[in-house]
Swiss-Prot record:
<dbReference type="GO" id="GO:0005576">
    <property type="term" value="C:extracellular region"/>
</dbReference>
<dbReference type="GO" id="GO:0043657">
    <property type="term" value="C:host cell"/>
</dbReference>
<keyword id="KW-0808">Transferase</keyword>
<keyword id="KW-0067">ATP-binding</keyword>
<dbReference type="GO" id="GO:0016301">
    <property type="term" value="F:kinase activity"/>
</dbReference>
<keyword id="KW-0843">Virulence</keyword>
<keyword id="KW-0964">Secreted</keyword>
<comment type="similarity">
    <text>Belongs to the protein kinase superfamily.</text>
</comment>
<feature type="binding site">
    <location>
        <position position="256"/>
    </location>
    <ligand>
        <name>ATP</name>
    </ligand>
</feature>
<protein>
    <recommendedName>
        <fullName>Secreted effector kinase SteC</fullName>
        <ecNumber>2.7.-.-</ecNumber>
    </recommendedName>
</protein>
<dbReference type="GO" id="GO:0005524">
    <property type="term" value="F:ATP binding"/>
</dbReference>
<keyword id="KW-0418">Kinase</keyword>
<dbReference type="GO" id="GO:0030430">
    <property type="term" value="C:host cell cytoplasm"/>
</dbReference>
<dbReference type="GO" id="GO:0046777">
    <property type="term" value="P:protein autophosphorylation"/>
</dbReference>
<keyword id="KW-0547">Nucleotide-binding</keyword>
<dbReference type="GO" id="GO:0030254">
    <property type="term" value="P:protein secretion by the type III secretion system"/>
</dbReference>
<keyword id="KW-1035">Host cytoplasm</keyword>
């Protein structure tokens, strides 16, 4: 079924398959000789060219997609002053260019939806007449900017305005003035340093330093950019766990590669392990350590393949004794003051101490604190992580009740109570005559998988 976009004084049609190819970031479709032949006669008899329509829509949505920088109509200037990924903006800019080229009476067919994606990262989906046109990842700070300039967050309606004249007549494609107005506001936004610290910084606006930090210099160095062979760095291994293995590849920095202690690759995009995605972990490590340059997510070429890894500062300190109650409370209070909470704070080695200063070196299970959650909602990655943690606690509680281990029963009850308080759930009172009731999870859900894995042990 073809979709029709009202562009300027004419309409453009594109098939669902070709539109899907554009959305999925495939290359521009190369029309065959037969398709060109048919389109030639279509143009003679109907004055329509589907090939021309396709190219017009493609060029609006995919501006200079083959180039690493946006060359126009959007200037790459703002990206040179900040650590910005212009590829995240490209789908959005193409979508707004498409709106700008459309007839004013059809603009109400364009809508936007915002979905939870990764921690502090949202997925912006852009539609035309209910059909998904394009999508892109966006930081929460950038979404706040778009809510002010582009769309109504409550209903998804487009609120873009033309530059200086909302009633500019559309005689030619792109003459509405909408894109030009948005471009000016976007440049102002990108060239204004992010005043927020900690969790308000996102993947698009990670740092505003005019000079690259030492960690950035390391990531951009030939030492990091070269092809790394695992067998060559095995001697630099300093630890491993469920989410990855850490190697010291520099005097000042370590790299965490998503291969666990059993040598199995960890899929950081899966529901089970989304919480350990380097983008997310880096944000929380920076928050926990109150240091925006403590860590970074980066791409490393390992055995000839690009792999997303976590780069963080190397701390030559001692393991902090969290078994000491005073130490435990001190670390907990420090995290709370920085707006975060650490689910695995009790694990020895996750916190180091150097010259009296605490360093949090494992961020896979760091989440927003209870106070921070009053200001903003958590992401899908955090919700899935805490579902797994609660399922684990409930299994342990069930076993303790079955074995009559009173001490463990009280311990796991307290953990569940604390978790419920953190995520804002009310404690469920057990039914009369039953001390514990575990509702059967829906088959195929993440919790069901966790329960099955636990019961196999």
């Amino acid at each position: 079924m073809p979709f029709t976009f009202q562009i300027g004084n004419h309409s453009c049609q594109i098939s669902e398959r070709y539109l899907r190819d554009i959305i999925d970031n495939k290359r521009e479709h190369v029309f065959s000789t037969c398709e060109k032949f048919i389109d030639f006669f279509r143009n003679i008899f109907t004055r329509r060219s589907l090939i021309s329509d396709y190219r017009e829509i493609y060029n609006l949505l995919c501006q200079k997609k083959e180039h690493p920088d946006i060359k126009g109509p959007f200037s790459p200037g703002p990206f040179s002053k900040r650590d910005e990924d212009c590829t995240r903006w490209r789908p959005l800019l193409g979508y707004i260019k498409l709106i700008d080229a459309s007839r004013p009476e059809t603009i109400d067919k364009y809508t936007v939806e915002v979905l939870a994606h990764q921690e502090n990262m949202l997925l912006l989906q852009m539609f035309y007449d209910g059909v998904l046109v394009t999508e892109t990842e966006c930081s929460e700070r950038c979404v706040d900017f778009l809510k002010e300039t582009m769309f109504n967050y409550n209903n998804g309606e487009i609120t873009l305005a033309a530059l200086g004249n909302d009633n500019l007549p559309p005689s030619e494609a792109g003459s509405n003035g909408i894109y030009e107005a948005f471009e000016q506001r976007l440049i102002d936004f990108l060239t204004t340093p992010a005043t927020a610290s900690g969790y308000e910084s996102g993947a698009i606006d990670q740092t505003d330093a005019s000079q690259p930090a030492a960690i950035e210099a390391f990531i951009n160095s030939p030492e990091f950019q070269k092809n790394i062979r695992m067998r060559d760095i095995e001697k630099n291994k300093i630890g491993s766990g469920s989410y990855g293995t850490v190697y010291r590849l520099h005097d000042d920095f370590v790299v965490k590669i998503p291969v666990n202690e059993r040598g199995i690759k960890v899929d950081v995009n899966s529901p089970e392990h989304r919480n350990c995605h380097p983008d997310r972990v880096s944000k929380y490590l920076n928050m926990a350590n109150d240091d925006k340059n403590f860590s970074r997510s980066a791409i490393m070429n390992i055995n000839g393949k690009d792999v997303t890894v976590l780069v963080s500062k190397y701390i030559q300190g001692q393991e902090f004794d969290v078994e000491d109650e005073d130490n435990y409370r001190m670390a907990e209070a420090l995290l709370k003051s920085r707006g975060v909470y650490m689910h695995d704070i009790n694990i020895l080695g996750n916190i180091l101490v150097k010259e009296g200063v605490l360093f949090f070196v494992d961020g896979d299970q760091i989440v927003l604190s209870q106070e921070s959650r009053q200001q903003r909602s958590v992401s899908l990655a955090t919700r899935q992580l805490e579902e797994q943690i609660k399922a684990h606690h409930m299994i342990k509680l069930k076993r303790a009740e079955t074995e009559g281990n009173t001490e463990d029963v009280e311990y796991y009850k307290s953990l569940i109570t604390d978790l419920d308080a953190l995520i804002g759930e009310e404690e469920q009172t057990p039914a009369p005559g039953r001390r514990f009731k575990l509702a059967a999870p829906e088959e195929g859900t993440l919790v069901a998988k966790v329960l099955k894995d636990e019961l196999k042990k």
